[in-house]
Amino acid sequence: MKRYYYMDVLAILATIAVVFLHTSEYAFSNHTSDPHWIIAVILQVTFIWAVPIFFMMSGAHLLDYRERYNTSVFFKKRMAKVFVPFIFWSLVWYIINPFIFHKPTDYHIGQFVDAVMHDTIQPIFWFFYFIIGFYISAPLLSKITNKNDKTLSLYLLAVNMVFVNLLSYYYEIRSQTDNSFLHGVQIGAAGGVGFFVAGWYLKNTVLHKWQKNILYVAALASVVIMITLTIYLSIKRGKFVREVYDIWGLFGFVFSIGVFEFVKNHLETYRPSLKVQFVLQKVASTSLGVYVIHEFFIYFAERKLHIVDSSLKHMLILPVIVWLLSTALVLFIHKIPLLNKIV
């Protein structure tokens, strides 16, 4: 199977971006008079493409899985790679949450199952629900994504953009009830579908130079609009308007696919030396592990080292240190039999 090294680069960049997102949550405080709040907002918007990149990479890798193996093998591979770590780390966080947040311990299996089913254990684990849902949908989506005829893929993307990226986003920003058409459309209106299919499409399509230029300009414009609108509406409404840079919104979607295409366009033919290949593959392989454990380091820095979340140290230096420590730990765990299955 051909290896695309730009995918390794994307995985590494997206992992770093995730950590920057989670160390700049001071933006949620809406302390609009503090210059550090504006920096936090800029960081939040600048790195919002992190999880969408993972979604697009999954679509790019897996929507043509039938070329390599059957659906039964696909499910075995995917569920072992993601479902097992999801359950394991959900259990770990379920056990230690009372100690982190100083709550009484009251463990029982029914409570754990309910917490897993309702995503109340670890907020950042929302990613797993979408990715597992994608795996379940992949056998159907893979019948729509056809390299020889991309018409249905484009139709699916168009439906997603109209009902999710435009209409749903419009009502979300206005704090209004979502449009009823969104719930009536039976396929294509789920937020994640757009990213999964977009990743597959961009991987298998060579855009014209003018198309790339339009996409890059639109992506940059989206960043400026999201930063400006988030700051303006947050000040005006007196509460943080997170919805502006929602990844399911038009600007978040355009920005994310712009990042994907930019890296692909510049590194698609990249063939690094054997030593660099080894390093890229090793570091890229830590992405899931870093995702599930990096919050431990952030909590430690905040509660034990007393690094205030409004400080520049927390927003600019801590994420680099957390990523390096998390990556090193995951690489170590990869060497341990059985434990290497959970990261």
Predicted features by range, described:
Residues A60-Y69, P139-N146, A198-H208, E261-R271, ...:
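Structural signal for the C-terminal ends of transmembrane alpha-helices
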Residues Q44-I53, Y65-N97, D106-P123, F134, ...:
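Transmembrane alpha-helical segments and their boundary/interface "anchor" motifs
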Residues R3-T15, F75, A80-F83, W210-V224, ...:
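Functional transmembrane helices that form membrane-embedded active or gating regions
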Residues F54-F55, L63, W93-H102, I109-K203:
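Hydrophobic alpha-helical segments with transmembrane-like composition
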Residues W210-F278:
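Alpha-helical transmembrane segments and terminal signal-anchor/GPI-anchor hydrophobic tails
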